[in-house]
Amino acid sequence: VQFKVLASFAVVLASSLTAALLRAAPPAPGPQVDITSPADHSRLAWQARGSYTVTVAYDGKSTRFDEIPSSNVLLAATFVADTDAPAARRAAPLPEALVHVTQSNCMGCHDFNASSGGPSFAAIGKRYAGQPTAAATLAAHIRNGSRGAWGSGSMPPHPDLGPAQATAIADWILAHGADPAVRYYAGKSGSFRMIAPGKPGPRAGLMLSAYYTGPLKSGATRNASGRNVVVVTGTGS
């Protein structure tokens, strides 16, 4: 009897220690994201284009050596009224819908702001704005494909995206696709444009925030370390 009691106690103790270790285990490290250009606190004329470069390191891989696809990097250019304000450095979390967009082949035909093989997300958001069934319609187009919605072209189906993922993308397009204060650019390098939603003041500019959108290891988050936010002040308004 004493042996059984000791054995039971040992099992309970081992279970408690295991649970404690699991609770104490630190979360898996997130990505290291650095905007290497433009320089922080740089200045650029409104309406001008500036170049950007982002490096991402995660799970022993890096964009420097093309081990992480360029499509797994996203840059957001957000208008800020005062580049010296603390809020100008508080980047919003990356919407999960944009993770789905960049991990699928959406960017092969769609751009955020310009027409390419298909309409831009901004144009789609404007066309369907205010329509009560817009989210369901867009989600169905994403999952099942469509024909004739934008001229004579057709959109292929995306069965790799589940209903919840397609709905999240549709909701984002309707709520934020045509937001004049934020523009998104896919890729580890490229160009952004200094655009303001209205007449900018003398302290206004853009907050550039970079994100890793690729797959994560179990327990990891997208909370990035590194210089993933820089501010560019607009000139010549």
Regions from the PLM with identified roles:
Residues L22-T53, A57-D59, F79-A87, V232-S237:
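Short, compositionally biased P/S/T/A/G/V-rich stretches that sit at domain boundaries
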Residues S8-A19:
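Bacterial N-terminal signal peptides
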Residues A25-A28, S71-L74, F79-A81, R90-A91, ...:
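Short beta-strand elements
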Residues G50-Y52, Y58-S62, P69-F79, H158-Y184, ...:
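C-terminal capping alpha-helices of c-type cytochrome domains
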Residues P38-L44, P180-P200:
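Signal that preferentially marks extracellular ectodomain short beta-strand elements
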